[in-house]
């Protein structure tokens, strides 16, 4: 009986990409897998053909040989480096079948790995909101959440009385059951002990043998100085309690820093925009600036300061986390143009503008308009 074309089996074109091959095989394998068709020999044979096709087409070298020689590339005595499918597949199918069957599949050589002590608890995430001042000073934040906690009646064992548990006779303590189907070893969680490998004789009435119950947890979280939005605080063992005394998961607390009315932050540096009067920018002087630590600092504004200029205050920013250092604070100047001037004030400004040395007083604007004038003169003369 002649073999079907591998590309036709998977419904693919000759130039199919590896991702298309994997997608097609996943779809067909789900349809014909023996677990989905118990006792159906035709489906089992179809599944073997599909797996054989996938094993060849997903491998670059095997695919090249198949494209050149067809099925004869893998026949005994072909002289072309034949592949013996009776020895099993070299391709790792586990990622495919983990997606399809929830992680219970083992391709080729099977594994008996099982975590001792039962199913560990899940990690949990909790988001909190803090102020920039909280981040600067460090703080303690009360939190509460509901999760599985260790049962107080049985101390997490799930059992009442002195006899805790006995070995499961179905899986013999392994927690899983293996069956051989064609080329594959299928490994499933034991349905009798739910993968624990043990059976409790007298289950705790409070937790029904799970060793844990749902309850509210109240904690006080220590937020370190300098923490930023997106950082996380890990609380070991404060996540979900494990099943029947297994290890608990961790709790991850993610702080979100509220928008500040005055400062913006970039790492350990702080930034703020400060409007100053035109006269102060022109003549120079000083301004009083608040810092995040609550102190005030006298800051010198240089004579002739321009809009957008930055003034730097060293080590007036945020603490660097787990360090004694601090970032800097940057003050960006916004020069405020006077409005609602009186007639007399306007006259004084006009008089100033008419002074003979105003060109030297305004080099940027004077230079700009000189360039514009030169540009138009060049156009007219061309």
Swiss-Prot record:
Ordered alphabetically, the record's keywords are: Chaperone, Cytoplasm, DNA replication, Metal-binding, Repeat, Stress response, Zinc, Zinc-finger
- Residues holding Zn(2+) 1: 151, 154, 204, 207
Q: Which SUPFAM superfamilies does the record match to this protein? A: Chaperone J-domain, DnaJ/Hsp40 cysteine-rich domain, HSP40/DnaJ peptide-binding domain
Q: Entry's Gene3D superfamilies?
A: DnaJ domain, Heat shock protein DnaJ, cysteine-rich domain, Urease metallochaperone UreE, N-terminal domain
Q: Which InterPro entries match?
A: DnaJ, DnaJ_C, DnaJ_domain, DnaJ_domain_CS, HSP40/DnaJ_pept-bd, HSP_DnaJ_Cys-rich_dom, HSP_DnaJ_Cys-rich_dom_sf, J_dom_sf
Pfam families listed in its UniProt record: DnaJ (PF00226), DnaJ_C (PF01556), DnaJ_CXXCXGXG (PF00684)
The record lists the membrane-crossing segments as none
Superkingdom to which the source organism belongs: Bacteria
Q: What is its main location?
A: cytoplasm
Query: What does the annotation say about its assembly with partners?
Result: Homodimer.
* Name of the protein this chain belongs to: Chaperone protein DnaJ
Question: What's the source species for this entry?
Answer: Ehrlichia ruminantium (strain Welgevonden)
List the gene name: dnaJ
């Amino acid at each position: 009986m002649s073999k079907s074309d591998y590309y036709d089996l998977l419904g693919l074109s000759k130039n199919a990409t590896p991702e298309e091959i994997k997608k097609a095989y996943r779809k067909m394998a789900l349809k014909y897998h023996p677990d989905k068709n118990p006792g159906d020999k035709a489906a089992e044979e179809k599944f073997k053909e599909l797996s054989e096709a996938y094993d060849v087409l997903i491998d670059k070298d095997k695919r090249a040989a198949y494209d050149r020689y067809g099925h004869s590339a893998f026949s005994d005595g072909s002289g072309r480096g034949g592949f013996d499918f009776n020895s099993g597949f070299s391709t790792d199918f586990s990622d495919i079948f983990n997606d399809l069957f929830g992680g219970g599949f083992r391709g080729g050589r099977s594994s008996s790995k099982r975590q001792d002590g039962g199913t560990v608890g899940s990690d949990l995430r909790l988001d909190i909101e803090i102020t920039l001042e909280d981040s600067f000073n460090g703080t303690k934040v009360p939190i509460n959440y509901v999760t599985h906690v260790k049962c107080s009646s049985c101390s997490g064992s799930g059992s009442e009385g002195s006899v805790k548990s006995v070995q499961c006779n179905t899986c013999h303590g392994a927690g899983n059951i293996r069956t051989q189907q064609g080329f594959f070893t299928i490994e499933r969680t034991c349905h009798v002990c739910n993968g624990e490998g043990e059976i409790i004789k007298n289950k705790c009435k409070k937790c029904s043998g799970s060793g844990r119950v749902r309850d509210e947890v109240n904690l006080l979280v220590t937020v370190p100085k300098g923490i930023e939005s997106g950082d996380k605080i890990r609380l070991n063992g404060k996540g979900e309690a494990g099943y029947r005394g297994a290890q608990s998961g961790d709790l991850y607390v993610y702080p979100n820093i509220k928008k500040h009315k005055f400062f913006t932050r970039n790492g350990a540096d702080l930034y703020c925009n400060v409007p100053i009067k035109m006269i102060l920018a022109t003549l120079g002087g000083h301004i009083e600036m608040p810092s995040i630590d609550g102190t005030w600092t006298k800051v010198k504004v240089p004579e002739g300061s321009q809009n957008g200029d930055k003034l730097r205050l060293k080590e007036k920013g945020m603490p660097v986390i787990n360090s004694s250092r601090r970032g800097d604070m940057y003050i960006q100047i916004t020069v405020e143009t006077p409005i609602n001037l009186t007639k007399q004030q306007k006259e004084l400004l006009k008089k100033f503008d008419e002074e003979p040395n105003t060109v030297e007083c305004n080099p940027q604007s004077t230079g700009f308009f000189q360039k514009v004038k030169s540009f138009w003169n060049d156009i007219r003369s061309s």
